[in-house]
Amino acid sequence: MADIYRFPKFSYEDNGTVEPLPLRTGPDKKAIPHIRIVKVGDPPKHGVRYLDLLLLGFFETPKQTASLGSVSDLTEHTGYSICGSGSLPIGVAKYHGSDQELLKACTDLRITVRRTVRAGEMIVYMVDSIGAPLLPWSGRLRQGMIFNANKVALAPQCLPVDKDIRFRVVFVNGTSLGAITIAKIPKTLADLALPNSISVNLLVTLKTGISTEQKGVLPVLDDQGEKKLNFMVHLGLIRRKVGKIYSVEYCKSKIERMRLIFSLGLIGGISFHVQVTGTLSKTFMGQLAWKRAVCFPLMDVNPHMNLVIWAASVEITDVDAVFQPAIPRDFRYYPNVVAKNIGRIRKL
């Protein structure tokens, strides 16, 4: 059983909504490219800004054509068939041009894709034809990039391994960053276990503009019967001296003094941002890696939900602080379904 504190609506009403990508098609029945930019923090209205970019589009393979052996076959355009949808995160850079120039440069990219495997399935991206607006990101684009397949492809099993695959960019998600950075809580701090402590987790409830059931993301019904999605992130631990009694009121007072502000961004798809505008204890500040603004990309928190809703409208409807006893340090974490060193199973 856990105790819950609900944050007031003003803590997320200013930047807690993301508008949908307009899915329109042209005369050729292809999707019309579009760029969507949201602001997190207080970025400058004009001039140089820091932009985080996520390219969205389709994986395509050449269409199969009958081999007739005629001369016209050498010049005939075969076309492409869509075999899946996905994304390419290219990170943060300084940018001073217009949004439309950036969109044009992104859709002009020639991106080849390969499906492979390491410890898990991966997608390899190789990029060519990098235009001038994308030069701030060129260092990363020219090197080639590898991502966890389940984070960047909606259905990686649909990507063939025996055919050439290209990634055609159609949409661009951009997050314009101000004072709020995209600092993440290091995994070692997020997994920290302290005796005699209370874990402060955030339960974030979302409303989306699409139906998610058919894609494997089941909503929950709220008290009014509306369908909502939710996810949880870990903020930190509250620790008291030995012998001191924890109370819900004590935990609530600690959270209220932080004066947290929440917002949504487009980093990795959909991202949840937390900014501390009030007072913060040294213990809690250390757990946040001495940052007063942190980012939780849904791509890392709940990859499948992120894949389903990253082009839809998304709105924060509630944020709750959930106070739970910290997981004891002697509890063992099992990241793999195969247990080590049991019976005939041995670690290599």
Curated annotation (Swiss-Prot):
A large portion is phosphorylated in the cytoplasm, but not in virion. However, this phosphorylation is not essential for virus replication. It is a peripheral membrane protein. GO terms for cellular component: host cell cytoplasm; host cell plasma membrane; membrane; virion component. Keywords: Host cell membrane, Host cytoplasm, Host membrane, Host-virus interaction, Membrane, Phosphoprotein, Viral budding, Viral budding via the host ESCRT complexes, Viral matrix protein, Viral release from host cell, Virion. The modification Phosphoserine is found at residue 70. One of its GO terms (biological process) is viral budding from plasma membrane. Its main location: virion. One of its GO terms (molecular function) is structural constituent of virion. A motif (YLDL motif) lies at residues 50-53. InterPro entries: Matrix_C, Matrix_N, Matrix_Paramyxo_C, Matrix_Paramyxo_N. The keyword Cell membrane does not apply. It is found in: Virion; Host cytoplasm; Host cell membrane. Homomultimer. Binds to the cytoplasmic regions of F and HN proteins. Interacts with nucleocapsid. Interacts with human alpha-tubulin and beta-tubulin. Interacts with host ANP32B. Belongs to the morbillivirus/respirovirus/rubulavirus M protein family. Plays a crucial role in virion assembly and budding. Forms a shell at the inner face of the plasma membrane and concentrates the HN and F glycoproteins. Acts as a negative regulator for transcription and replication by sticking to the nucleocapsid. This effect might be regulated by the cytoplasmic interaction with tubulin that dissociates the M protein from the nucleocapsid. Late-budding domains (L domains) are short sequence motifs essential for viral particle budding. They recruit proteins of the host ESCRT machinery (Endosomal Sorting Complex Required for Transport) or ESCRT-associated proteins. The matrix protein contains one L domain: a YLDL motif. This is Matrix protein.
